[in-house]
């Protein structure tokens, strides 16, 4: 099955999750591609499309919303999934798609209903932020 994971990341943590999914998938060999590099992507050739996106300062990248808007009809005809990477998912009460506020806002804003939805706790890498 031809499969792709398209991801949006800021510090690389979402990309690491995508690579982990790809290396641990027994049924699929995913192509893993940054949302920044999909300008000429022929998305209709894939049977399974996964979109992974991280939250930065409370928001997804605008490219994530643009992607869903541009490809929603194709996504709905394919096997698809969406996962969010965000820090609040570290809290038990926000660790499920049904209780994660970022996923709920995303679903409402895009009016897309992915066939599978996941949420992963994000990483806050304080030492690399160079506050001082």
Residue ranges and their predicted role:
Residues 51:
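Redox-cofactor binding/interface segments in oxidoreductases and associated redox assembly factors
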Residues 1, 44, 112:
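Structured loop/turn residues at beta-strand edges in well-structured enzyme cores
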Residues 2-27:
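N-terminal beta1-alpha1 ligand-phosphate binding loop
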Residues 9, 36, 86:
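Short beta-to-alpha linker loops that shape the active-site pocket of alpha/beta-hydrolase fold enzymes
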Residues 24-33, 48, 57-132:
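FMN-binding flavodoxin-like domain, especially the glycine-rich phosphate-binding loop
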Residues 38-45:
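Short amphipathic alpha-helix with an adjacent loop that forms part of the alpha/beta core around
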